[in-house]
Each structure stands twice: as C-alpha cells, then as structure tokens.
C-alpha cells in the first residue's frame, strides 16, 4: 500500500508543484488505485509515473474549488484512449455539484466515454460512512474551509492471521489439501488420530491500516476525529509558522496547526502538502523543522513522491 503525490501545490501550479491530486495504491490488496482530487494537469503528472489510468477505479473529491477538480474532464477523457486495454467503469465520490461539473464538461466538449461513471454525491447531512467493501471502509466528515469541503478516513479491515507452515509440518501434516483446510480455520484429524486445532497454527488477525486524507481546512475538531490513531495523516500546510491569521482568513492551515492535529489525533506519520508557491526549497526545510517541534514524524511531500504505508 502506497501513497503517491501527483500535485502538492496550493491554488495554482508552479514550476516545482502541480495543483492537488494524490493516489492511494491498493494494487496488492485489491488490484485498484484510488485517486483523491484531480487538479488541472493531473493526467500529465500520471505520465511521469507507473500508474495505469484504467486501474483508477474510484475518485474522491474533497471540494469543488478549481485547483482540486479542473483536471477531471481531461483525465476521464484520456482514460478512454488506453489502446488495447480493457475499459473499466469508475466511481466518483464528492460534494453535490461534482456530477453536474463533470457531465457538463463532457457534454459541451462532445466527449463520449466507453465506460460508465457512477456518482456518489453528498452534502452536510449525508456524511459518515460513504463506502464499505469486504476489505475497506471510507468515512467522510466536514472540514472548515471557505466552501463545503470534506476529509476522508480510509480504514482497511483487519487482515487474516497467517499460517505457521513449519509448525504444521512438524506436527505431521502433509502439504496439500489438509494444509488448505487448516488455513481456512478448519480443524482436522490425521490418520493416526491426532487432532489438529487450526487456531493453534494461525496467528491472530493483524490490524489493517488507517489513512486520513484531508481537503483544504482551518484547524478544526473534525480533522482530529478523522485522524485518530491513523497510520498516515495527509494535511495541508498552505501557510507557515506565524501566518495563523492569514490562514484563518483564507480557510487554510499552517504547518504548525497541522502538527497540532497530528499530535492530538495520535497519528504515526504526518505528511504535509498543499504548499504555497511562496515557499522555496530552503523554506520547506524550515517548515518541516518547525512542525517537528510539535510532532516529530513529519515530512513535507513533493510532486511524484511515493510513500510506503
């Protein structure tokens, strides 16, 4: 499971950072890739990666500001041009209005897609659990921005315990169908009458990962709720230390406020993105150092960077 950042800038693209988009790679878990926001130029950023557009099965939009959605029509159109590849349907989750934006753009441009788009829109009264599969659950909650904006909490369900094959062989169980039965939790009896209790050879279930991805926001209690005990928190840092008044005025956060959220939520790792073009490379180092005085395990991500979860 990995996060790859396609755009880490704020508001408008710069030479160093494109506007907002990232993907959660779940190839080993479910052979899918989930995208979060799709700012202008996202499809071009994908060309610099190994991501296959047809593998992107779900897109989660945090809010309807242009730097988070203007790349959608182009990406969806280009996704249909994957020659010799199977066309796969796609689901888009986001605030009410995202369907109208996408369909209007496709209609006006005369774009015809060979696959289906399923929209899942929500407003302030329909948040909470927005998706559940056999392996993942996704929650959304309202943040505090200048327009309706949400954050997402992606929870992987507990993983099955692993079979201790060496211990099982030592108990006299031959490799083959009996192994499969024990792996599936079924007790067996060997030819000599020895009873094998499956639970004795399977480790306890392993807790799944939790990833929190926030849209644009001021520091707010819902950010903490979404991030409680998360393995990774992706939080915006449009502004730096000392810019709290400016951040509040424009509906954003500073690096220090993001670190406070991470500390209060008890997350394992904080990844800062949505960085203003005002910050040069040397400023990024200071931004990280300042935030680390509040929450130690913090990193400011850059475009195309991939983080293992």
From Swiss-Prot:
EC code(s) of this entry: 3.1.26.11
Note on cofactor: Binds 2 Zn(2+) ions.
Biological role: Zinc phosphodiesterase, which displays some tRNA 3'-processing endonuclease activity. Probably involved in tRNA maturation, by removing a 3'-trailer from precursor tRNA.
Binding-site list for Zn(2+) 1: 63, 65, 145, 216
Active site: 67 (proton acceptor)
Cofactor: Zn(2+)
Protein name: Ribonuclease Z
GO molecular function: 3'-tRNA processing endoribonuclease activity; zinc ion binding
InterPro entries per UniProt: Metallo-B-lactamas, RibonucZ/Hydroxyglut_hydro, RNase_Z/BN
Keywords noted in UniProt: Endonuclease, Hydrolase, Metal-binding, Nuclease, tRNA processing, Zinc
Binding site for Zn(2+) 2: 67-68, 216, 274
Source taxonomy: Bacteria, Bacillati, Bacillota, Bacilli, Lactobacillales
Catalytic reactions of this protein: Endonucleolytic cleavage of RNA, removing extra 3' nucleotides from tRNA precursor, generating 3' termini of tRNAs. A 3'-hydroxy group is left at the tRNA terminus and a 5'-phosphoryl group is left at the trailer molecule
Oligomer status and interactors: Homodimer.
SUPFAM superfamilies from the UniProt entry: Metallo-hydrolase/oxidoreductase (SSF56281)
Similarity remark: Belongs to the RNase Z family.
Organism: Streptococcus gordonii (strain Challis / ATCC 35105 / BCRC 15272 / CH1 / DL1 / V288)
Pfam families: Lactamase_B
């Amino acid at each position: 499971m990995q996060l790859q950042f396609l755009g880490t800038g704020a508001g408008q693209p710069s030479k160093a950072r494109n506007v907002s988009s990232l993907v959660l790679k779940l190839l080993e878990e479910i052979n899918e890739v989930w995208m979060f926001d799709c700012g202008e130029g996202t499809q071009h950023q994908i060309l610099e990666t190994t991501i296959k557009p047809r593998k992107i099965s779900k897109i989660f939009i945090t809010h309807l500001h242009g730097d988070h959605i203007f790349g959608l029509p182009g990406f969806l159109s280009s996704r249909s041009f994957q020659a010799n590849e199977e066309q796969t349907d796609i689901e888009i989750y986001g605030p009410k209005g995202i369907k109208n934006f996408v369909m209007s753009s496709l209609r006006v441009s005369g774009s015809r897609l060979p696959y289906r788009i399923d929209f899942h829109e929500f407003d302030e009264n329909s948040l909470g659990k927005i998706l559940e599969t056999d392996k993942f659950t996704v929650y959304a909650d309202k943040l505090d921005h200048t327009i309706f904006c949400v954050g997402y909490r992606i929870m992987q369900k507990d993983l099955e315990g692993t079979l201790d094959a060496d211990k099982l062989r030592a108990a006299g169980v031959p490799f083959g169908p009996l192994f499969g039965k024990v792996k599936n939790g079924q007790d067996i009896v060997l030819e000599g009458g020895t009873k094998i209790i499956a639970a004795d050879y399977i480790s306890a279930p392993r807790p799944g990962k939790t990833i929190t991805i926030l849209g644009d926001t001021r520091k707010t209690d819902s950010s903490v709720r979404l991030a409680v005990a998360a393995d990774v928190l992706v939080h915006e840092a449009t502004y730096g230390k000392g810019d709290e008044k400016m951040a509040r005025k424009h509906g954003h956060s500073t690096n220090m406020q993001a670190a406070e959220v991470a500390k209060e939520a008890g997350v394992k790792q904080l990844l800062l993105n949505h960085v203003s073009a005002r910050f040069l490379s040397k400023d990024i180092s200071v931004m990280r150092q300042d935030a680390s005085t509040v929450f130690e395990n913090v990193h400011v991500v850059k475009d195309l960077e991939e983080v293992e979860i």
